Amino acid sequence: MLPSQAPEATKLIVGTRSAWLAARLTVEFNNQSWVVYGYTDASKLGESRKFAAMTLKDRRQHQRDAAKKLLPGLKGALDIAAGRIQAFLAVADAEGLLHLAGDLSEHLADGVNLVHLPDILESALASLRVEKARETMGTAIRQAVRLEDYPESFRAHTRKRRLIAVLGPTNSGKTYDAFKRLAKAESGVYLGPLRLLALEAFNRLNDEFKVPTSLLTGEDRRDVARSKVTASTIEMLNPDRQVDVAVIDEIQMLLDPDRGWAWTQAVVGANASEVWLLGALSAEAAVRALASRLGLELEVHYKERKHPLTVAQNALAGDPIAALRQARKGDAWVVFSRRNALTLRDDFLARGMSVACVYGMLSPEVREREAQRFADGDADILVATDAIGMGLNLPIQRVVFTAVTKFNGEEVQRLEVPMLQQIGGRAGRYGHQPSSKGKQAKDGIVVGLTPDEHRVVVELMQAQQTPLPARGFLIAPSQAYLERLSKLASTERLEALLAAYEQHADQGDGFFRAHVPQEMLDRASMLDAMQNLTLQTKHLLAMVPLSSQHEVLGATWTDWVRKVNRDVPVGLEFLRGHPENAALDKAEMAVQQLWAYLWLSYRLPDSFPMAEDARELLEPWVEAVDLHLRGHARQGAARTAGKAAWYRPAPVRRRF
């Protein structure tokens, strides 16, 4: 249809500096009306401040007067504009772009200088073509990456499998039952969330259960002759290896926002006749949903605590200084930062008590040594962060919460029920709690430091854990997915491919959900700036276990990436000084850097060729950390007489 070229109305357009009279033009195309308010330099009415001071009545009168004078002159410009818009719409329609042109339609209706209309339409057409290409690409990606087909990408999909869920609180014997089953299996694998747990499984299966077991983590590999079982971190799952029994620990981490994808992958892809799922009762609904979706037989076994757990009737003391005097052998005092752990340790040492200390920055080897000192009675008190929530079977008689809030990376939040209950459940660990001959061992006890903390401890220890959702299981972008997307998009830019995966993968009914780990996203842009890295290498470097948030460790990662890009072998020059002279924080960083170097040496051996040297240097640096923690030198914040620098009062909920 031909456009309507007659102006039907006028509009006063007031900009930041000037004001114009615009005339309305309606263009009819394919039964749709495109409304344009157009003006020219000739229809300028003056400075905008003049109109800002007018009343609405005066504005309207001025608009009517201007229309009588200026509309005839605008008609020619409107006629030309109508033809240009008609031509634009015809091209956009032929290329299937009109459904994307909503923003342009609004822009034209708001008012446009007709002198600039050709440039506006040309730019809009180019933008619409880009948007159409993205839309087409999104459709292709949805067809190529269908998350509901995820299970079919694993060999396990073709074999008969049975899920056995063993659910219960801490100290209920779940792991012991699973280890007994692994001991009887012809072949098996243990998959845990931490290198510490894999190491514990490795040691227990070899020493306690007499099962030849190898260790396989991202950083550490120990082959044992004639091994039947492999103890591994969960990300190291080998879905192509067939085994009789696979044990997946801490199954309640299925919906963890950072690492839940690894549990989804393990449940879906573990190539075993029996897949044991160990974890909290809150995971039951999620486990049942997965079993149903995968069409697998499921057995659920419920476990009870082997040793009683009691929440103390009262807080430990009225204030933190008085609470220190109530500390006793067998206590575990819980804090939520490295600084507070070391400062509290210092205060106990000043009172003449021996202390073991465990926190997240420590390597598994040091944590295990510190835990052993406590277990052997060489340390009276254990000071720990939430790092003791998983693993580390210890003879803890009482767990003391010095805080009930934790900084989550963005803000300070109150502890969630599962975390507090899991840490509290470390008290009275089965098989470790000492008892006298013929007498029952004492209950494990959980207590808050002061009344403020204790009120929260009582509330959360009595609370029911919220069941995990039965859908929304995370799937991270595998190398195979990224290569598929790269071919479709004709690019190896990691950032673009990760965004395309998260935005366009076909998520079906939402049972499975596309997820890109934040650390990977944060690193992608810099990796794309490196000209010589393949997509596979960029993907691998994005997963290096070094925190980008830590200034020194982040700088180490950046330096390594640049050297790999230049094809320069990475040496051990990142190590500064000697372990025997290093401060605690320097020694901790050196251990983390060495483990990350070993992680990369398994994957990029040509770029990280000094693995043997790194392994030899690791022990002296681990020993340096251990010596600091076993020593009596102050490691935390400066001490202030009469004050507990490690204590922050719990927020009080006021009642109105």
Residue ranges of each PLM-predicted region?
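Conserved strand-helix element at the start of the C-terminal RecA-like helicase core
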Residues: 187-201, 276-278, 284, 325-351, ...
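Inter-Walker segment of RecA-like/P-loop motor cores
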Residues: 205-243
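Post-DEXD/H (motif II) to motif III coupling segment of the RecA-like Helicase ATP-binding lobe
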Residues: 252-307
